[in-house]
């Protein structure tokens, strides 16, 4: 088994200051991993950690430098285009990217998304929707969804409350209802478990073949009982493992996952199989 983490932020040591600054400015109770063997590191250090933990691929949010929202500048924690390009070139197959689309730029933003999706490292787009105060069914997103439908790539979005001081209502999972109907072949991943609207997120994943639930940002001990039960039974083909690193460390999350005692089939689907179905551009695994 080779783990795929569907959502990480930039992991370079210099990004620690950006997290510290954002937390200090907003005064929010958000923590990031600080232990040296599970926190920020350089590319070679992350690959060594991935090899140790059995992780095949990290999917990294990647975007341009621009301010998002009133208090939070999300771009400070994502990879830059050139960083993603360098990671992908130096460590083929280990790092791929989700383009952090900006719906405020109109057609220029759509063209930038199109340019990003033409890159070898791109496997989909990411919507940090709270930064833009737009629900998932906002008209500004539809051209980006259409590009993803054309390119057969996934859309990942932070669902639920915002970790920063931004409007949370726009992250309600029910907002995916109309886009999932309009783009039936496009995979949509409701990240962050949809908390506090977990039942609503699960309902969307149950209703639509193309809607999935992602666990990023919450370590397994903090998953709602509903998420655990969904992953174990009705949603075994619908739940993706993620960390939103550095808010959750890989070593930390994988150790806690063992405590839930999922059977082998559920574990394989959550850690790898479901992600490989959602992200069709992931490197194909060699079968020995």
Spans of model-derived segments:
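Mid-to-C-terminal alpha-helical segments outside catalytic/metal-binding sites
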Residues: 1-6, 13-57, 236-238, 248-288
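Histidine-centered divalent metal-coordination motifs
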Residues: 4-13, 128, 158, 192
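Conserved, mostly hydrophobic/aromatic
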Residues: 7, 50, 84, 125, ...
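Active-site environment of divalent metal-dependent phosphoester hydrolases
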Residues: 11-14, 65-68, 103-107, 132-133, ...
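Short, acidic/polar
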Residues: 41-50, 105-116, 198
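Generic structural signal for well-ordered alpha-helices
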Residues: 43-47, 81-88, 113-114, 141, ...
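Active-site gating/metal-coordination segments in enzymes
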Residues: 56-57, 62-66, 70-157, 161-163, ...
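Catalytic pocket-lining loop regions of alpha/beta-barrel enzymes
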Residues: 120-124, 134-240, 286-287
């Amino acid at each position: 088994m080779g783990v795929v983490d569907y959502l990480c932020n930039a992991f370079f040591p210099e990004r620690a200051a950006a997290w510290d600054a954002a937390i200090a400015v907003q005064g929010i109770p958000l923590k990031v991993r600080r232990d040296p063997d599970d926190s920020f590191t350089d590319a070679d250090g992350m690959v060594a950690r991935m090899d140790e933990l059995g992780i095949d691929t990290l999917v990294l949010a990647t975007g341009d430098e621009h301010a998002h929202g009133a208090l939070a500048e999300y771009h400070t924690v994502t990879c830059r285009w050139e960083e993603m390009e360098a990671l992908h070139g130096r460590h083929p197959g280990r790092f791929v990217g989700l383009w952090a689309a900006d719906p405020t730029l109109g057609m220029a933003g759509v063209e930038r998304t199109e340019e990003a999706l033409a890159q070898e490292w791109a496997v989909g787009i990411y919507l940090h929707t709270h930064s833009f105060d737009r629900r998932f069914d906002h008209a500004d997103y539809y051209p980006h969804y259409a590009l993803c439908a054309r390119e057969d790539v996934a859309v990942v979005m932070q669902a639920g409350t915002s970790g920063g001081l931004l409007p949370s209502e726009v992250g309600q999972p029910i907002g995916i209802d109309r886009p999932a109907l309009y783009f039936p072949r496009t995979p949509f991943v409701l990240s962050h478990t949809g908390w506090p609207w977990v039942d609503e997120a699960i309902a969307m994943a149950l209703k639509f073949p193309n809607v999935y639930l992602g666990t990023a940002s919450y370590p397994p001990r903090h998953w709602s009982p509903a998420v655990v039960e969904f992953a174990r039974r009705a949603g075994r083909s619908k739940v993706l493992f993620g960390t939103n690193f550095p808010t959750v460390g890989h070593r930390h999350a994988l150790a806690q996952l063992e405590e839930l005692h999922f059977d082998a089939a559920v574990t394989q689907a959550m850690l790898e199989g479901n992600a490989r179905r959602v992200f069709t551009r992931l490197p194909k695994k060699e079968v020995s």
